[in-house]
Amino acid sequence: MRYGADQDLVLDLIPGAEQILHYFSKYQQADGRIKGLPGWNFSDWVYEPGWNMGVAQVGSDGGGILMDLQLLLGFQMMSDLENYQGNTFMAKKYDDKAAQLKASIQLAYWSAEKGLYAQTVEKELFSQHANSLAILAGLVEGEQARQVAEKMLTDKELAPCSVYYKFYLHEALVKAGLGNDYLNWLDIWRENIAMGLTTWGETSDVDGTRSDCHAWGASPNIEFFRTLLGIDSAAPAFAKVKIEPRLGDLKKIGGTMPHPQGSIKVNYQKNGSKLKADIELPTGVSGTLVWAGKTYQLQGGKNTIEAR
């Protein structure tokens, strides 16, 4: 919906998305949390206590945080889709479901002692996965989200995300305000390159992975544009653009990103806290540039901004 031009396709797929959420809703308990979900509930290839064939821990009450967080994110996204097609009744339905589940997750899994979300109600095991999704779902915001994000990077007791799930980890770290460190998070991809791979392995175990070509590990392909160059959609069908560069130690960088109406071209030169940004948007597309807490307006065509 946010990036593509075929909005009719999005509308056609909404009924199917509703049915999928209805399936998971059948396993919700009175407090909204999921219990007894059948099948192989794969989350990530994690080789830590309590994980089994990619499936996260289930607590003594039969529930676990990852399935609950995925359902919460599904409700939140479904509300956006319903609002987009003008169905405010259904949007409110999903908002209400999300609000109940969000409160239940907070009560069941938040560890005040650890300052993190636990895998189960026992609050003994923790993961980058759960805390990434918690940030993305808005359970923690502002300074508290930043604190959780920093712990995900430093607390070695957390089960780590594999190369595939780092997509969500990095998205959460950026949302929490740590995006300027993005280039410091790419060690596993550098290991792949050092091994001579030209595609990405299935798991973070580069020496032992069964597959040397798994597209699910290719998140830098989008994050170089969305995080580093900071180009992102700000409206359905990419009708508006928000550009918020996170350059880290880089002084100069540029790139071109495909857009339904052409392409977005950027070139940045950073000098201390100052940024010179040459930005070209497709005709008829407007947007904003965000730098150092200030917002600058962008119009279709060429824009040159001296930001500080």
Regions found by a protein language model. Give the residues of each.
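Well-ordered alpha-helical scaffold segments within catalytic/enzyme domains
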Residues: 1-9, 70-88, 132-142, 168-177, ...
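Active-site acid/base region of carbohydrate-active enzymes
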Residues: 3-66, 82-131, 238
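Generic recognition of stable, solvent-exposed alpha-helical segments in well-folded globular domains
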Residues: 12-19, 66-80, 89, 93-100, ...
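Long, well-ordered core segments of solenoidal/helical folds
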Residues: 14-33, 96-115, 140-160, 177-196
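Charged/polar, low-hydrophobicity segments characteristic of intrinsically disordered regions
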Residues: 26-36, 107-116, 160-175, 197-209, ...
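Generic beta-strand/beta-sheet core signal
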Residues: 37, 120, 137, 170, ...
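Solvent-exposed loop and edge beta-strand segments that line ligand/cofactor-binding
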Residues: 52-70, 113-131, 137, 149-166, ...
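Non-catalytic C-terminal accessory modules of carbohydrate-active enzymes
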Residues: 96, 103, 180-308
